[in-house]
């Protein structure tokens, strides 16, 4: 993020990070990842999703950061939401875009 901040006055920048899986680090005696989803503990199935946007990006895309913060606290999302969210951020017109899967669309 520090590198993106260096360029915030020159470019509209955004970073979206999501881990592909969680990891059990000894909780309940379990040390691993890859447990079948239906029996996997929350440490393996709940992963961080972090988004950082430069002020110029937020302004150009008309994003309401308060709305995004509210959604972050009250909405559960999954990896399934990433694809349409990225398409929506860049206004890519395609039949595979699903507005319901776009976690940012309701905050624009």
Locate each region found by the language model.
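Catalytic domains that recognize anionic headgroups
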Residues: 1-108
């Amino acid at each position: 993020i520090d590198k993106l901040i260096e360029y915030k006055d020159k470019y509209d920048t955004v970073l979206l990070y999501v881990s592909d899986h969680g990891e059990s680090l000894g909780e309940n005696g379990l040390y691993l990842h890859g447990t079948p989803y239906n029996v996997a503990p929350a440490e393996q199935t709940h992963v961080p999703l972090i988004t950082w946007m430069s002020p110029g990006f937020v302004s150009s895309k008309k994003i309401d950061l308060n709305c995004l913060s509210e959604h972050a606290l009250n909405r559960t999302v999954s990896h399934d939401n990433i694809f349409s969210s990225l398409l929506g951020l860049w206004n890519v017109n395609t039949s595979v875009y699903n507005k319901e899967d776009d976690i940012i669309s309701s905050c624009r």
